[in-house]
Curated annotation (Swiss-Prot):
BP GO annotations: tRNA 5'-leader removal
EC number: 3.1.26.5
A Pfam family annotated for this UniProt entry: Ribonuclease_P
Taxonomic source organism: Mannheimia succiniciproducens (strain KCTC 0769BP / MBEL55E)
GO cellular component, one term: ribonuclease P complex
Protein name as catalogued: Ribonuclease P protein component
InterPro entries from the UniProt entry: Ribosomal_Su5_D2-typ_SF, Ribsml_uS5_D2-typ_fold_subgr, RNase_P
Assembly description: Consists of a catalytic RNA component (M1 or rnpB) and a protein subunit.
Alphabetized UniProt keyword annotations: Endonuclease, Hydrolase, Nuclease, RNA-binding, tRNA processing
Similarity comment: Belongs to the RnpA family.
Reactions this protein catalyses: Endonucleolytic cleavage of RNA, removing 5'-extranucleotides from tRNA precursor
Job of this protein: RNaseP catalyzes the removal of the 5'-leader sequence from pre-tRNA to produce the mature 5'-terminus. It can also cleave other RNA substrates such as 4.5S RNA. The protein component plays an auxiliary but essential role in vivo by binding to the 5'-leader sequence and broadening the substrate specificity of the ribozyme.
GO molecular function: 3'-tRNA processing endoribonuclease activity; ribonuclease P activity; tRNA binding
Length: 122
């Protein structure tokens, strides 16, 4: 049975881990959100989130966005390549309702899966 947990080892925790992804990322983006990715040497993908107060003033809005991102990652983690992912929230993300937001995330994850397969074949 496949475990669909989101344990500590699946998270980017230190500034150095985030910096590694920001240096030379693969990008998939929409006007409201960007997912950056970079290959890691581990046997599993990891996730980091950046949701600035500049874009979402209220804590409960930032928490909603982070919760939806974590849930999306948790459900797709076994389909994703072994990359470190950083989700960057942009202006206008707070206006999206939950079903729209999860649909956008799903499209971006699929784009990263395709990009990873393409980079492996090269």
């Amino acid at each position: 049975m496949i475990k669909l947990n989101f344990s500590r080892e699946l998270r980017l925790l230190t500034p150095a881990q985030f910096k590694y992804v920001f240096e030379q990322p693969l990008r998939a983006s929409t006007p409201e959100i960007t997912i950056l990715a970079r290959r890691n040497d581990l046997q599993y993908p990891r996730l980091g989130l950046t949701v600035a107060k500049k874009h979402l003033k209220r804590a409960h809005e930032r928490n909603r966005v982070k919760r939806l991102c974590r849930e999306s990652f948790r459900l797709l983690q076994h389909e994703l390549p072994n990359y470190d992912f950083v989700i960057v929230a942009k202006h206008g993300i707070g206006k999206l309702d939950n079903p729209t937001f999860t649909a956008i995330l799903s499209k971006l994850w699929q784009r990263h899966i395709r990009l990873a397969k393409k980079s492996l074949s090269n």
